[in-house]
Amino acid sequence: MQRLIQDFSIPAVFAGFITFLIGISVSAVLVIQGAQSLGANTAQISSWFWALGLAIGLSGLILSWKYKYPVATAWSTPGIALIIASTGHYDLYEAIGAFLVCGIAIAIVGFSGIFLKLLAHIPQSLTCAMLAGILLKFGIQIFSSMQTYLGFILSMLLIYLVSKRLFPRYSIVLTVILGAIICPFFIEFQLHSITWSLAQPVWMQPAFSWSALLGLALPLFVINMTSQNLPGIAMIKSYGYQPHVNQLVGWTGVAHTIFAPFGCFSVNLAAISAAVSLDDQVHPDPAKRYIAGISCGVFYILMGLFAATLVSLLMSFPQIFIVALAGIALFATISHNVALAFANVEEREAALLTFLCSASGVQFWGIGSAFWGLILGIFVLILFRLKLKK
C-alpha cells in the first residue's frame, strides 16, 4: 500500500479514465444492441454491464497491481458485432452457454502456454478477413442511413473527421460527446428520467448446442485471441515491458468464465485504448505507470455497479444515433483488418473468399458465416499451397 501511495499520480489516474472512456464510449451501445438481439430484457441488459464492468475492472486492477505494469482489459467490439450479426439464430441462453465455453477455452489455452502455438496455424490474413467481413455491414449501414438522416449523418462524419485530424487519440470520445450535443437539433427525442441505482446481477442459465458452440463460441474465441489478446500483448511489449503472456490470457479467461452466466461475453487485453495507459505521458518512470491500469480497472468497476443508470441513459437516445456511432467507431477496425487481410499477395485469394463469405451472413445448420468463412479460407489456402504431382 505504501508503494501505491508513493507511485500515485494525477496524470496516471486521468490516463486510466481516458482508457476506460475510449473502451466504452461507443461500443457500450453495441452491447445493448447485442443483448437485445438475443431477446434480453432491461434487467438482463443491466446484468450484462454489471458482469462486464466487474470482470474487466477486477482483472485489470489485480493484474496491474501484481505485475506492476499497466494491464488494461476490455470487452471485444468485434466480438459483440459477431453476436449482433448472429441475430435470430441463437437464443439468449444458448449464447450464454457459448460465452461460458469461450471463457473456459481462453483460460485453458492461456495457462497451458499453447496460445501462440495454436494461433500460429491460423494465418493472420484469414482472421482479419473474417473480422472485416463481419464488421462490413456496420460501416455500410451508416451510409445507407443518409437517405433518411442526411444532415445528422453528415454532421457526425464531419465531427469524426475533424477530430480524427486534430486529436486522433480522442476522436471517438469527442464524436460521442459532440454527437450527443447536436443530436437534438436534427432528431426529436426526450431523455428518460435518470435514476441512480446499483445494478442487480441476473443469472441466465447456460444452454448448450452444437450450432451455438461452432457458430458463436468458436468464432468468438478466435476473435478474442486474434483481435484483442495478440495486439494487446504486442502493445505492452512495444513500450518496453515483458508481459506475462500465459498469466494475462489465462486470468482474463477465468474472469470471463466466472461472469459469463451474468452476461459477460468477453474479457480480453485492450489493444488500441491500452496505448493511453502505457504512454510516457502517464509518468516518465515506466515502473510507475501501472497506476493507470489500476485506475482504469476502478472506473470499470464503478460502471458495473451503476450499470442500470448507464443502460437507462444510453437507451434514451434514438436508434440512428446508435447506428451512426457504431459505424464510425468501427471505421478504424474495418480498415485495419482489410489492410492486414490483403497485405500478403500469396494469401489474397483465400482472404478474399473468407471476407466475402463472412460478410454474406450465410447460415448452414444454424452455424454462422464467420465460421464458414474461416473454414473456406483455410481450405483455399491449403489447396493453393499443395504441390501438384507431375
Model-assigned labels for residue ranges:
Residues 21, 25, 38, 62, ...:
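Structural signal for hydrophobic packing residues in well-ordered secondary-structure cores
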Residues 49, 56-57, 209, 348-349:
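Intrinsically disordered, low-complexity segments enriched in polar/charged residues with Gly/Pro
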Residues 31-35, 59, 80-84, 140, ...:
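Predominant activation on well-ordered alpha-helical scaffold segments within soluble catalytic domains
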Residues 9, 91, 167, 209, ...:
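Alpha-helix initiation/capping motif
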Residues 1-46, 172-245:
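Helix-loop-helix hairpins and the membrane-proximal interhelical loops
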Residues 25-26, 151, 227, 269, ...:
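Residue-level signal for transmembrane alpha-helical positions in Major Facilitator Superfamily
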Residues 88-194, 295-390:
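Membrane-embedded alpha-helical modules
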Residues 2-6, 12-31, 50-131, 243-331:
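Helix-loop-helix junctions within the multi-pass membrane cores of secondary transporters/permeases
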